[in-house]
């Protein structure tokens, strides 16, 4: 379990995160949503142990991040950054994936085997010998997914994972997230992409100015009459479901089109 | 007359077996906005590099065909003229921000072009106001969010009023409300100033109401080009992030009945009043 207890963080002026307490359980999919600059990424970095709270505590399986070595934290928590350029530095794609594995003590051959498997999963096998920084923006992003997937942490944090991704990559990402959840991992996503998150109906924390202003499942969020106060863009499938008067909103275009077909054309 | 003409352009990066661009041709009339879409790795960035002359100047490989900007071959235009003709906003604002303070960053290009101080101050103030980031003018760039940085990067390019503006996924780091605002603001500014634009976007819905044309790329080739609404309706592939309501219509009715989301919701409203959802 990841547990935040009355956590505060500041970059110098005012609090970027202010008094947040919450728990994330194993096998849960949790989304942090909110505007640019609301504090979502800061919360993600606190949970990944990259930054430490100035007040309060972050516990990862009862380890307080303030007095735990970062190498022990990364075995449990993997974070995929919004900007892939921040985490790519090796000379080839294959070595990039192997880097973290070798640091965790895997033998070179085993690390290579694990890296190759992960590159296959993300359709990057053909790029194994290319320099990471020569890849396109979308490919670099996929590479960062492959890196974290390879080292298999218990908690995986995706910071704005849909940025710069085409439809196929998003479909692959959806499959990956569902598989991770099924295998008992916790997946934490910070995003402003409600259209993407909607299919999962995740446990959602709405963040404004470093505070949690709403929490619950995403379906509930957009079925509230006053959701517009959070300035979040409603997923189109949610809006169409409401227009159709559906008691349970459809989570996918397939589901919704079947409902529409069932009731005849407009 | 076109601001951009790409004629039978092919390019293969040195050492790569496949063509990154394969006989690409397209024209963009003055004052028009085009979305360039296609899956990751299809050649969009390579095409932008060729349009800006970076290919073949800085990337080695086999180059055939030509790119004309404002009627002139991009390879014969001096660097100074090119900078005034084409404005390029990178996908990642970190790649183009060089100053410490927002205001200085936005003024940087104009200072380099040698304009006088009053002109620069006036232009910089106006563009910051037009983009709604005037209150950020004295902030150090490092204190801004990614979204705010992107707006500053856009301001720094728009302030130079290029003939052709290239935006490489300009709103990918912005939340939808901010993205829509940037899209409509950029649209308003470029229409007022008569600037043409090429926008690379995965989230087509953000700019689909503003753009005139759309080009779809796949494996180095242009597979469709034309009026954006028609291209979106024709599109049957699996690569583009088509808006959810378009997807629903195609799946439910086999065609697109309403091209704007609001229109589709109104249709549903009207039909439910007639007793049919």
Briefly describe each language-model feature range.
Chain A
Residues 48:
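Helix-to-loop junction immediately C-terminal to a conserved catalytic motif
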Residues 33-35:
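The feature captures the beta-strand-to-loop junction immediately N-terminal to the Walker
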């Amino acid at each position: 379990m990841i547990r935040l207890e009355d956590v505060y963080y500041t970059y110098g002026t005012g609090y970027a995160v202010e008094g947040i307490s919450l728990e994330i359980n194993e096998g849960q999919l949790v989304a942090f949503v909110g505007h640019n600059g609301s504090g979502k990424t800061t919360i993600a970095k606190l949970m990944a142990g990259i930054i430490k709270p100035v007040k309060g505590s972050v516990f990862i399986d009862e380890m307080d991040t303030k007095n735990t070595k970062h190498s022990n934290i990364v075995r449990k928590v993997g974070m995929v950054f919004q900007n892939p350029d921040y985490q790519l530095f090796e000379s080839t794609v294959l070595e990039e994936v192997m880097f973290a594995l070798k640091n965790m003590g895997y033998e070179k051959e085993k690390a290579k085997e694990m890296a190759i498997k992960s590159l296959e999963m993300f359709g990057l096998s053909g790029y194994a010998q290319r320099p990471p920084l020569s890849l396109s923006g979308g490919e670099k992003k996929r590479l960062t997914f492959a890196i974290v997937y390879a080292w298999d942490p218990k908690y995986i944090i995706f910071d704005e994972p849909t940025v710069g991704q085409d439809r196929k990559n998003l479909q692959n990402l959806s499959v990956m997230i569902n598989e991770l959840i099924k295998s008992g991992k916790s997946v934490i996503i910070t995003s402003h992409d409600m259209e993407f998150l909607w299919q999962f109906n995740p446990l959602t924390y709405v963040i404004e100015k470093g505070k949690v202003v709403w929490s619950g499942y995403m379906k509930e969020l957009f079925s509230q009459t006053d959701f517009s106060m959070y300035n979040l863009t409603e997923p189109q499938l949610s809006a169409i479901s409401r227009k159709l008067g559906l008691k349970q909103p459809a989570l996918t275009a397939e589901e919704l089109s079947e409902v529409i077909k069932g009731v005849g054309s407009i | 007359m076109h601001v951009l003409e790409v004629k039978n352009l092919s390019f293969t990066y040195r050492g790569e077996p496949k063509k990154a661009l394969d006989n690409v041709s397209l024209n963009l009339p003055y004052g028009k906005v085009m979305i360039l879409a296609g899956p990751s790795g299809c050649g969009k960035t390579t095409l932008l590099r060729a349009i800006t002359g970076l290919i073949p100047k800085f990337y080695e490989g086999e180059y055939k065909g030509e790119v004309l900007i404002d009627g002139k071959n991009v390879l014969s235009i001096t660097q100074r003229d090119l900078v005034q003709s084409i404005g390029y906003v990178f996908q990642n604002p970190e790649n183009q921000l060089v100053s410490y303070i927002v205001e200085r960053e936005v003024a940087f290009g104009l200072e380099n072009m040698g304009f006088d101080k009053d002109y620069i101050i006036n232009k910089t103030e106006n563009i910051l106001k037009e983009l709604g980031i005037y209150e950020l003018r004295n902030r150090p760039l490092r204190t801004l969010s990614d979204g705010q940085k992107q707006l500053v990067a856009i301001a720094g390019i728009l302030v130079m009023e290029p003939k052709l503006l290239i935006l490489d996924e300009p709103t990918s780091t912005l939340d939808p409300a901010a993205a829509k605002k940037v899209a409509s603001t950029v649209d308003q500014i470029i229409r007022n100033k008569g600037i043409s634009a090429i926008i690379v976007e995965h989230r087509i819905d953000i700019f689909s109401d503003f753009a005139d044309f759309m080009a779809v790329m796949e494996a180095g080739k242009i597979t469709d080009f034309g009026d954006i609404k028609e291209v979106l309706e024709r599109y049957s592939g699996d690569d583009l992030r088509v808006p959810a309501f378009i997807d629903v219509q195609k799946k439910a009715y086999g065609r697109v009945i309403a091209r704007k989301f609001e229109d589709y919701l109104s249709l549903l409203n009207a039909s439910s009043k007639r007793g049919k959802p």
